[in-house]
């Protein structure tokens, strides 16, 4: 059963549990992830990142994600992970994804806010939840432990207040 990201995260906060998010590059990956969620009777986020499009095109994967999510009895969010542009987020929404993540972490802070707001306006008009990113999540090497890659708490508060995103990935 397809649910919204916001709804799933609110339930997880109430129940004090985490929700697994899995990038799936094939129908077999999608089926395996959902089967595991069914066996555990657990909610799940199945997601596809823009960097994976060369081997798992959005137009081919979206129908598989959506059908698998509709056919199960566990809550499933179908999510775009690390979308790099307005167009990518719009494409995922047009394909039926109920949640998109805009990754503007490499942008200057003010530009990240501006672009996130643009995407959030479009997504909200379509009833789609939005996640954004601050800091360098998943982009830090072992030798790169500098404090400047971590999310500043005050920036995160300001970012969420100005964008009203449903979720925020922080480093």
Predicted features along the sequence, with ranges:
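Alpha/beta enzyme core
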Residues: 3-11, 25-52, 58-75, 83-171
């Amino acid at each position: 059963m397809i649910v919204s990201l916001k709804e799933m995260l609110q339930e997880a906060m109430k129940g004090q549990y985490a929700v697994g998010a899995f990038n799936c590059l094939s129908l077999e990956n999608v089926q395996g992830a959902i089967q595991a969620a069914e066996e555990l009777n657990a909610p799940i986020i199945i997601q596809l990142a823009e960097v994976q499009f060369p081997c798992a095109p959005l137009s081919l994967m979206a129908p598989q994600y959506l059908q698998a999510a509709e056919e199960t009895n566990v809550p499933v969010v179908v999510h775009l992970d690390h979308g790099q542009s307005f167009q990518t987020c719009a494409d995922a929404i047009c394909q039926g994804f109920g949640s998109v993540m805009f990754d503007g972490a490499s942008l200057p802070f003010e530009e990240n806010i501006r672009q996130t707001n643009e995407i959030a306006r479009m997504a909200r008009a379509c009833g789609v939840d939005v996640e954004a990113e601050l800091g360098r999540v998943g982009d830090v090497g072992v030798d790169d432990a500098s404090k400047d890659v971590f999310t500043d708490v005050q920036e995160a508060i300001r970012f969420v207040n100005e964008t009203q995103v449903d979720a925020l990935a922080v480093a």
